[in-house]
Amino acid sequence: DNVDTYITFHGVESAMALWVNGTFVGYSEDTFTPSSFNITDLIVNGENKIAVNVYRFSSGSWLEDQDFWRFSGIFRDVELQMVPHIHLKDIKILTHLNENYDHATVEVTPMIEKKEAKFKAVYTLKYKDEVIGQKESKDCCSPINFELDDPHLWSAEKPNLYQLYVEIMDENGLVECSQHNVGVREFKLIDGIMCINGKRIVFHGVNRHEFSAKTGRTVSYEDTKKDILNMKANNINALRTCHYPNQTFVYDLCDEYGLYVIDEVNLETHGTWSELFDKAHILPDDKPEWLDIILDRANSMYERDKNHPSIIIWSLGNESYGGKNLYEMSKFMKQKDTSRLIHYEGLSHDRRYNETSDIESQMYTFAVEGTSR
């Protein structure tokens, strides 16, 4: 009676509808971010029937025209989660450094969901096995700060990680415990140069699709770890998740081993703006009916990935031309997060909203101006 049951689909291409014991639960699009459904009131003791209808094509397909192999189906994990009556629904972790980088504040903002119950939350920050600090709170949403002298900073060269433990207790004892990695770092532009902890970053990066020659879109943790270690062995220090959010453990590995990440929204509308079509067909462009859809995709990526120190840049997508909707997405992300930069390469095709991107880049830079070479 004191738990809720959720089912989470971490990757379904391109859309899905869910039934539990014959009752329709919901519908979801966005191939590359999780979809969760509360099924507490629909399950029974004993055997239950979960039915999923996967749609190869949907309205979301217009936004998923990436250059890759075409598949459909459930290709990432499916989880059943039993959530206690008091639990940590969300957590946001920010780190702030002084100008000398010898003092840091770790700011923890929880969102504890409770059902008319008294509780206490204990926040413990450790570095390796050493307890750095511990705080208690009976408030569900107020920030908790830890002050660190001479902090162990995170960078690709030295990916130091602290561990934050959150224990939630009621009058009967421990209800829930979770662990979160914390990378203390500051990423910002200094005189137009991208810097980590005050030092210039020289990027040696790659684009990486999440794909296996043997298992297609389903890529194991072990194979992913090999990829990350091969990158490190070859002096690669950055990757772009082209062209969609990857599995969560990709970012965990980048946090652990030290890679800078450009995390990219699942958005590419390549086929709508080629030379074969006029501008009336371009998506999402300025069309108001597409704005909420792309903002939802950006928000899903942000909320899932916001606490990873390895992510230093948010990418709004790939090869989706330009326009007001992408500009609105950029503003949305900047309101959510001021600790990272925003990138969108497609501005080189449409200069109406140059403020969309903090960074200027070109996908295919021509060596000779005015030619295809």
Language-model features: locations:
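N-terminal carbohydrate-binding accessory modules
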Residues: 91-92, 165-232, 252
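Surface beta-strand/loop "capping" patches
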Residues: 84-115
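Beta-strand-rich binding/interaction modules
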Residues: 20, 103-137, 144
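Short strand-edge motifs at loop-to-beta-strand transitions and within beta-strands
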Residues: 33-37, 140-146
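Substrate-binding/catalytic cleft of secreted carbohydrate-active enzymes
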Residues: 228-231, 238-373
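Short glycine/proline/serine/threonine-rich loop/turn segments at secondary-structure transition edges
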Residues: 3-4, 43-47, 147-161
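Accessory beta-strand-rich segments of carbohydrate-active enzymes
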Residues: 1-89, 115, 245-247, 260, ...
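Short hydrophobic beta-strand segments in globular cytosolic domains
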Residues: 25-26, 132, 201
